[in-house]
């Protein structure tokens, strides 16, 4: 079945999350060491499920302060500019090809400001951009998915494809809801069961264009 809608994880799937964070830390004089990226991701995941809701800028700041004992001002600046991190080179052209087949919607654990930054880096707007700041939930909370379905006026099912490099944040829940899942094998991805597996978004463009 061809997709009627594609939703995308952004950080780690479209945006090169690790490279962006590594470069930001290097500019602050604190190179990222082995194992620290995963530790930061895991701490962010825990903070995202706490209440009251915090925006992603604050989540990033707290995770850097707690995991790396990082300076508060630098950590806040890194969180503010996360949407300016580089996109994967294959992303812009591939997403344009995919958007010719079906709407492409960001479904991202980030802030609205990061969406403005990231779409500027892509060079165009996606069909819609729905972020944690909009719904006051973070993936993998199923309530995020329910709110996305409500906003888009769609029912979960195989015509809705969800695309991510992360099983734990995205694909496991998407599968449980009956969506078609696509795993993108990015560096530092977290693999898991998926209906389709591609090396990059060019591979996805080829898949949906068949």
Language model regions located:
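Short glycine/Trp-rich loop-beta-loop segment that forms part of the substrate-binding cleft
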Residues: 99
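N-terminal helical cap/lid subdomain that shapes the substrate entry/recognition surface
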Residues: 2-89, 93
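Asp-based, Mg2+/Mn2+-dependent phosphohydrolase catalytic module
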Residues: 1-6, 18, 72, 92, ...
């Amino acid at each position: 079945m061809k997709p009627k809608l594609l939703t995308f994880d952004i950080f780690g799937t479209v945006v090169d999350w690790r490279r962006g964070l590594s470069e930001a830390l290097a500019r602050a004089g604190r190179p990222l060491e082995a194992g620290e990226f995963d530790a930061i991701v895991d701490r962010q995941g825990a903070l995202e499920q706490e209440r009251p809701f915090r925006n992603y800028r604050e989540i990033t700041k707290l995770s850097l302060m707690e995991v790396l004992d990082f300076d508060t001002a630098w950590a806040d600046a890194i969180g503010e500019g996360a949407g300016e991190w580089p996109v994967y080179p294959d992303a812009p052209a591939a997403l344009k090809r995919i958007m010719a087949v079906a709407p492409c919607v960001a479904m991202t654990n980030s802030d609205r400001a990061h969406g403005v930054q990231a779409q500027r880096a892509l060079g165009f707007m996606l069909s819609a951009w729905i972020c944690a700041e909009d719904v006051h939930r973070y993936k993998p909370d199923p309530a995020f998915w329910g709110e996305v379905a409500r906003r888009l006026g769609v029912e979960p099912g195989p015509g809705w494809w969800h695309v991510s490099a992360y099983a734990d944040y995205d694909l496991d829940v998407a599968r449980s809801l009956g969506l078609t899942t696509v795993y993108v094998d990015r560096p530092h991805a977290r693999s898991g069961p998926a209906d389709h597996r591609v090396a990059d978004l060019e591979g996805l463009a080829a898949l949906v264009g068949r």
